[in-house]
Amino acid sequence: MMLKPSIDKLLDKVPSRYSLVILQAKRAHELAAGAEPTQEFSSVKYTLQALEEIESGNVIIHPNPEAKRKLARLKVIQARLAAEEEERKIKEQIAKEKEEGDKI
């Protein structure tokens, strides 16, 4: 039985079989969790869809995983700060409206 995509083509995209398996598993989990696909698929299974994306070059191993982790943490912090700022503005607006209501 011939695998599609070919293991040889896939190994050209990653440094080792281990890396291929890890990348495929992570991407399959992302797809199963509702991540946006990068292309149209001929397969219905998430594991095969992940392999199709790897073969096409749409999914790669990040060259600097630590930088990727730092960027992800930074995005979380920025989102939290934005939410706190929004909450602060809402509280100020409520206090202002309450103060204006007390004047009437």
From Swiss-Prot:
Its EC number is 2.7.7.6. It comes from the Bacteria. Pfam families: RNA_pol_Rpb6. SMART domains: RNA_pol_Rpb6. One of its GO terms (cellular component) is DNA-directed RNA polymerase complex. Keywords: DNA-directed RNA polymerase, Nucleotidyltransferase, Transcription, Transferase. The keyword Nucleotidyltransferase applies. It catalyses: RNA(n) + a ribonucleoside 5'-triphosphate = RNA(n+1) + diphosphate. GO terms for molecular function: DNA binding; DNA-directed RNA polymerase activity. One of its GO terms (biological process) is DNA-templated transcription. Promotes RNA polymerase assembly. Latches the N- and C-terminal regions of the beta' subunit thereby facilitating its interaction with the beta and alpha subunits. Belongs to the RNA polymerase subunit omega family. HAMAP family: RNApol_bact_RpoZ. The RNAP catalytic core consists of 2 alpha, 1 beta, 1 beta' and 1 omega subunit. When a sigma factor is associated with the core the holoenzyme is formed, which can initiate transcription. This is DNA-directed RNA polymerase subunit omega. It comes from Streptococcus thermophilus (strain ATCC BAA-250 / LMG 18311). The lineage of its organism: Bacteria, Bacillati, Bacillota, Bacilli, Lactobacillales.
